[in-house]
């Protein structure tokens, strides 16, 4: 892999984007991110939610006797409140969850260390987007090619670059690195836009802004990220 493309790969990794090198290809990388189908927010595969109500795991212990909360870093597995000695379990934090309001269900979850105990049958991976609540996700993926220039980007030169590198898919994207007074400016153009575009502008001084363009998040009204 050439140095310019390698630097682009590292920049994507630094912005929490997964990067892969296609078999038998050295002129491009594949970048992908698991996102919500509805709003585009990153789908947090490392998070878990309550089986009963969907509340996120806040990673706290709770005494099953007095209700005192503890950080998971607590070395003790029993409550330190004087005269209590209750057992620390990982309950759902939603006070209206039936794992707290229904005695039979609460007893069943507590016996397994709480809803969020690693060995509990009620501990499930994230099933809802943390931003909009959607249940659908997908991998948004691009095949990335790097084009570096010290002069104003030229559409004809980019078309020739695309032809030489055999770009042919809507997922193929050219990342443009335009060096101006020793300062790098970034731009991009999808293969699908090459024939209809007559002018290229490189408007991003930060690579993270370019990533936000490729993986936009459309926050629904009345929802705060």
Swiss-Prot record:
According to its UniProt entry, one GO biological process term is: DNA restriction-modification system
Q: Name one GO molecular function term.
A: zinc ion binding
The prosthetic group or cofactor this protein requires is:
Zn(2+)
Thermal dependence, as annotated: Is one of the thermostable restriction enzymes that remain active after 20 to 30 cycles of thermal PCR cycling.
Q: What is the effect of changing residue 53 to A?
A: 10% of wild-type activity
Give TM segment ranges: none
This protein's assembly is summarised as: Heterotetramer of two alpha and two beta subunits. The alpha subunit is believed to be responsible for DNA recognition, while the beta subunit is thought to mediate cleavage.
Name the chain's protein.
Answer: Type II restriction enzyme BslI subunit alpha
UniProt source species:
Bacillus sp. (strain NEB-606)
Gene giving rise to this polypeptide: bslIRalpha
